[in-house]
C-alpha cells in the first residue's frame, strides 16, 4: 500500500464529507406565547406536529399548509413544513419553506441552520456556505454549524477556510470526532502532513469504527513511507468497509485521480 501516487487525488475520495450528511436540527416545541396565532391556525399547526411525529408526512404538510393559509405570516408553520418536506427527502420544497420561515423570522439561527443543511442535501455548496455563515452570525457558539460551514467550504476547495471552521467546531466541542477527521483531511489537502496525522489519530481515538478516518491515515502513512502503519490502517478499513478498501486498492494501484463523492 505504498505506491507513490498523488496524495490529494487519493484523499479526494473522502475529503470533507464526513460520512453521513448533516441532519436537520429539530425545532423546539412551539410555545404559542411567542407570537400571536389565530386559534384555527394553531389547531392546524398542532395537528401537523402530531402527524409528523407519527411519520404521516404528507398529511402533516397539508396541515401546516392549512395553518399558513389561515395565517400567512406563521413562521413556525413554514419551518415545521420544511422539516416535514426534508423528512420525505423533498429538499427543493424544504428549501422554499425554510427560506420563507427565515424571511418571517430572520433572527432564527435554527431556521438558517436547517436551510443550510437542505442546501447541502442538494449539493448547492455556495448557498450552503452563505447560509451557514449567517447562522453563525446569529449563534456563533454552535459547533455543528461551524462544522457544516467547514464542509461547504471544503466542497468549494476553500481548504484554508474549511480548516478554520473545523478547528472552531473542535474548540466548541472537543469530542466531535467528525470535525477532527475533516480537519485532518483539510490539512492533507493543504500539505500540512504532521498536523493531518495528529488530527486523524485523534479522530480514530474518538471514533475507532469510522472507516474513512482509517482510510485517510492509510494514505498518510503510505505517503510517509511507513509500510507497517499503512498496512495496519488498510486492514482496519477492510474490516470496517470492504468496498472502501477495494476502492483504495484500485486507486493505489492505478495512481489515478479519484472522483469527488
At which residue positions do the language-model features occur?
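Structural marker of alpha-solenoid helical repeat scaffolds
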Residues: 70, 104, 138, 172, ...
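Structural signature of tandem alpha-helical TPR/SEL1-like repeats
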Residues: 53-66, 87-100, 110, 121-134, ...
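Helix-start (N-cap) detector for alpha-helical repeat units in TPR-like alpha-solenoids
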Residues: 34, 41, 75-76, 109-110, ...
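N-terminal leader/linker segments that initiate helical-solenoid repeat arrays
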Residues: 21-58, 62-65
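Bacterial N-terminal signal peptides
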Residues: 10-20
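Canonical tetratricopeptide repeat
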Residues: 46, 80, 114, 121, ...
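Terminal, low-structured helical/coil segments at or just beyond the last alpha-helical repeat
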Residues: 26-37, 215-261
